[in-house]
Regions:
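Short secondary-structure junctions
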Residues: 26-32, 53-54, 97-101
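Short, low-complexity, polar/charged sequence segments that are solvent-exposed and flexible
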Residues: 22-26, 66-70, 88-92
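Ser/Thr- (and often Asn-) enriched beta-sheet segments in non-cytosolic proteins
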Residues: 5, 36-38, 60-62, 67-71, ...
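Intrinsically disordered, low-complexity regulatory segments enriched in Ser/Thr/Pro
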Residues: 55-83
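A conserved amphipathic terminal alpha-helix motif
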Residues: 78-108
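Negatively charged, low-complexity tracts enriched in Asp/Glu with abundant Ser/Thr
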Residues: 1-47
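Intrinsic disorder/low-structure terminal segments
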Residues: 26, 36, 56-58, 92
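Polar/charged, Gly/Pro-rich intrinsically disordered segments
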Residues: 11, 44-56, 60-63
Length: 108
């Protein structure tokens, strides 16, 4: 799990809206691929998955105050599409953060 601090309080709905609007277009642009990801709220978390290619979620994001707890599926750590999604998420979290300031709290 990775925990980042975005220095402002956010909600599942805000994260969901941002990812639904921007994740797939940015992925298509970066990978020159028509693969799209499903993004939805599940039990207080935002989950990203691609059922045609992967079993289960790729990422699960849970807001806790100013922190985001991000779980990456251990099955796809070295997968190029998962790495691309993670890179896009990092840039989108900077966009979401107060003054673009993202601090890594824990990575493990």
């Amino acid at each position: 799990m990775k925990i980042i601090n975005i220095h402002k309080t956010t909600t599942t709905a805000e994260i969901l809206a941002l990812l639904q609007q921007k994740l797939n277009p940015l992925f298509h642009e970066q990978k020159q691929s028509d693969m799209s990801f499903d993004i939805a709220e599940k039990n207080g978390a935002v989950e990203i998955w691609q059922p045609e290619t992967y079993e289960g979620f790729l990422f699960r994001i849970v807001p806790h105050g100013t922190q985001l707890h991000i779980t990456r599926s251990e099955h796809y750590v070295d997968d190029v599409n998962s790495i691309t999604v993670e890179s896009i998420l990092n840039s989108l979290f900077e966009e979401l953060a107060k003054d673009g300031n993202v601090t890594l709290v824990l990575e493990g």
